[in-house]
Amino acid sequence: MRSVWILVVLGFLTSAGGIRAAEITDAAGNRLPRPFEVRHVVCSGPGCLRLLIYLQAQDRVVAVDDIEKRRTRFDARPYALAHPQLSSMPMFGEFRGYDNPELILALNPAPEVIFKTYPGLGHDPAKLQQKTGIPVIVLDYGDFGSRRPSLYQSLRTMGEVLGKEQRAERVIRFWEETIADLAARTGNIPPGGRKRCFVGGIALKGPHGFQSTEPEYPPFGFVQALNVARQPGSPSGAVSVAKEKIVAWDPDILFLDLSTLQTGEEAGGRHELEEDPAYQVLSAVRRGAVYGLLPYSWYSHNFGSILANAYFIGKILYPERFGDVDPAAKADEIYSFLVGKPVFETMNQAFQGLVYRQIPLK
């Protein structure tokens, strides 16, 4: 009977034939020798396939969840745009981790490993492993904030399983160097020189209007922007704030997450800024200081878009500190490293050419 084990990898040995586990630990705490090669995998859960592609291991994928089969006018997932072949692969289940064990068992070639993010969503990892007999490795997707160590550990774990340890370290180093560059450009801005900003239209499991924001919006933090929605006790994720608060804050500059365009011409953040009398009193609206950003929360965090947005925001807030930066070119530099192709213009066209530009309002 196959032993149930989830996370796992205490050590790996590299051989000419691939990667084999020197030791694993099962769910009961048993340490078992179990050599194997990992040439075929599936990635379950938001962002899981993104991490695999960051590691340049897309050739190991044997099936995808149903979100990868969809093609819509709007798509802000650079990894999917850079690798359209994923959409023609077999399907193993529904998105957000709702895996189908029967479909997984029917795959040919069969996966040796299932990677899974957000284990609380969809199919329980232990039950999935019991039903399929395939090891399920749970990954903490983390973020660019306080959970950055978890993100890095997940990349390293995935890298060890796939024999992509060096690539995992390169990705981590790239992120750290990019974040350090942003800090070097803006770290000495005095508190009184920080611009007051607000970002609206933040997506959360779908598009939202202008009141949807994020108090801990990562790009603001990377360039020392003063996020007016960041108040004592504010949650870290997306929240909807009262319109009256936005008016009272009266930010110097407004940014719009362009995922809000999915709501259509008669709804969403841009429409609200144009038509809602409450927003007409905002000084940023009157001055035309409203700018479009790439959506970054699209089947979990797009880490490349977070960094690209930070460079654009920095250039708008402190142009003298970002004079050498072309935001579109910088975005493509980031995407080329992370997903293998420059996909900025593809996304810009999908979002009406409004990415990294002043948004015209009626």
Residue ranges and their predicted role:
Residues C43-G45, L49-N108, E112-P119, V228:
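A short, structured surface patch at a secondary-structure boundary
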